[in-house]
Amino acid sequence: MKQPFCIWQDIYVVGSAEISHPYDCCVYLVDAGELVLIDTGAGEGFNRLVGNMLTLGFAPEKLDSVIVTHAHIDHIGALSRFKREYGVKVIAHELEARAIESGDGVGAEFYGVDYQKCSVDMKLEGTEHDFHFDKYDIKTIHIPGHTQGSIAVYADIAGGRVLFGQDIHGPYEVGWGGNPGQAVVSLQKLIDLKADILCEGHFGIYQPSSEVRQYIEGYLYQLEHKIAGER
């Protein structure tokens, strides 16, 4: 396994398929004064995630919250353990809360793992939210398309805008809770944020801003042409 690393001031990768467990999404840690995790991986790599935090000098007991980008197992599998062992607040869009709390539709069967249900402390309504921490504000924006309650997370830190866009690559299939038409609108919203750094859900880090834009536009182009071809 590779080692966790710093992406930008106070932002770290603590999990991924290469860092914590092959089933895991990219798991990001923000030191905003309080520690905030973006997603948790599929659950099998929990101990590795905790160890990676310790390697970087962060005590998991200092975790304040986990922001869930969407309710697929590779992003939420370790939620219940983080909540049970460290008392984190779980933040998710209200449209994802049912899946997180019931386990329905999270896709655990595709990975052959057991999902442990988890209560959601803060169910986000509407489009945008701003969370105030000691050092930084962290913002969320509703971006339906991959799932109905998908959110992106972003923060302005040390002169750069960092976007946790997560599964920009999709899929956007209806069977996974997706909607290609909604995804087109959502991808344009992400482009309009003009991020300097993109922290993607599975494919790592993109920078500078020109590469961020190019990456998102590539998937937007594919979706638009797919939709046009189906008409």
Model segments located where?
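Short Gly/Pro-enriched turn/cap motifs at secondary-structure boundaries
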Residues: 18-19, 119-122, 142-144
